[in-house]
Design a protein with these regions (language model features):
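Transmembrane alpha-helix boundary/anchor motif
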Residues: 18, 59-62, 104
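Non-transmembrane, membrane-proximal soluble domains of secreted or membrane proteins
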Residues: 24-42, 67-355
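Short, Lys/Arg-rich N-terminal segment immediately upstream of the first membrane anchor
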Residues: 1-6, 78-82
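Hydrophobic alpha-helical segments
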Residues: 2-56
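Membrane-water interface of transmembrane alpha-helices
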Residues: 55-70
């Protein structure tokens, strides 16, 4: 029995070591200012909580040993029921910790708000007045990532790059289900949701190649929904952009509709140009121009609805599911309604940009 137990223990230790060998300390030692502040917040909060946890555990073990049944020297007071000093310590110390945690939470919730533009690129280094954030539009698909650079006019699949020490302004949406964008070295997790737009302001402070992933289960290909994030110098980023323009194709609405079909382990793709208005159509869920946009539906609802007559505006649309089977679903055809109800950024070639 004993040799078997020893062998089992060794096997468990080796298995645990093998499993943990792939772990990385990037979460606690990131290379982006926002992620560094979040790591500091984790450490501060943990230390504050340990101020209560450690003494409680230590006193529990001490009391259990000191007042054990076999210790006849310990004070025995079966009628004791109150101590003002103990009450103050028991209730006062946790209350002070909770107040401290609450204050830290309130301050950092506003300071690290992902929608809040950056006021610094690192500790003691404010954002220069002449530096404009890099705009990046990100779309979580089944099961890949699409990144659109509106200022550069390019797009990539499963590859992201940004200059070091330049603020990045991300806008996120999704094609089908809720997902989560996460680059541990850059910043915390941000949800992506279909028909909605979330944001993140971040900065990378050290050149390198970092892992990015989907941090939320979203179907069969979820585990392969990964990409590489490149932190580059300004010159390297300019060359990277030029490389996409030279070797890439054009990302049109028709190309996007093919790209959004479910697929896993998608290789890196590069697009030299992006059709104007594509991002707005993605968020508004009407890349297929035969379908009604979300903003149009909201305008109809705001006006009281279309009643039974609205059924005449429906149509059947083809769709390929995760297993590759061709199916059909009912969608609403387009109607004439006010534009840009979602407050989307103005893109070249769109009505919002022309107004």
């Amino acid at each position: 029995m004993y040799p078997n137990k020893s062998l089992l223990t060794r096997a468990l230790v080796l298995s645990a070591g093998a499993a943990l060998s792939g772990c990385s300390g990037i979460v606690m030692k990131p290379h982006g200012d926002i992620a560094q502040q979040q790591a500091q917040l984790i450490v501060t909060s943990t230390l504050l909580m340990l101020l209560i946890i450690v003494p409680v555990i230590a006193l529990t073990l001490l009391f259990a040993y000191r007042y054990r049944q076999s210790n006849t020297d310990a004070t025995y007071a079966p009628d004791w029921d109150h101590s003002t000093r103990l009450e103050l310590i028991i209730w006062g110390a946790p209350l002070l910790i909770i107040i401290a945690l609450g204050a830290i939470t309130w301050i950092t919730t506003h300071k690290l708000d992902p929608f809040r533009p950056l006021d610094r690129i690192a500790e003691g280094r404010p954002v220069p007045a002449d530096v404009k954030p890099l705009e990046v539009y990100a779309v979580s698909m089944d099961w890949k990532w699409l990144f659109i650079y509106p200022e550069q006019g390019i797009a990539t699949v499963n590859e992201l790059a940004a200059p070091v020490d330049r603020p990045i302004h991300f806008r996120f949406t999704s094609t089908s289900v809720m997902n989560t964008f996460y680059v541990p070295a850059l910043a915390g997790m941000i949800y992506t949701m279909p028909g909605m737009q979330t944001q993140l302001h971040a900065v990378i402070n050290k050149p390198g190649v970092y892992d990015g992933l989907s941090a939320q289960y979203s179907g069969a290909g979820f585990s392969d929904m990964r990409f590489k994030f490149h932190g580059l110098s300004d010159e390297e980023f300019a060359r990277w952009v030029d490389g996409n323009r030279i070797g890439g194709a054009a990302l049109t609405r028709a190309g996007y509709l093919k790209l959004e079909q479910p697929s896993a382990k998608e290789p890196i793709q590069r697009f030299a140009s992006v059709e104007p208005g594509l991002w707005s159509a993605i968020v508004d869920r009407c890349v297929d121009d035969r379908k009604m946009c979300s903003s149009q539906m909201m305008a109809i609802d705001a006006a009281g609805g279309a009643g039974k007559g609205g059924l005449a505006g429906t149509m059947r649309s083809a769709w390929r599911d995760a297993e590759g089977r061709n199916r059909e679903r009912t969608v609403v055809a387009a109607l004439c309604t006010p534009t840009n109800l979602l407050g989307l950024p103005a893109e070249a070639g769109t009505p919002a940009a022309q107004n």
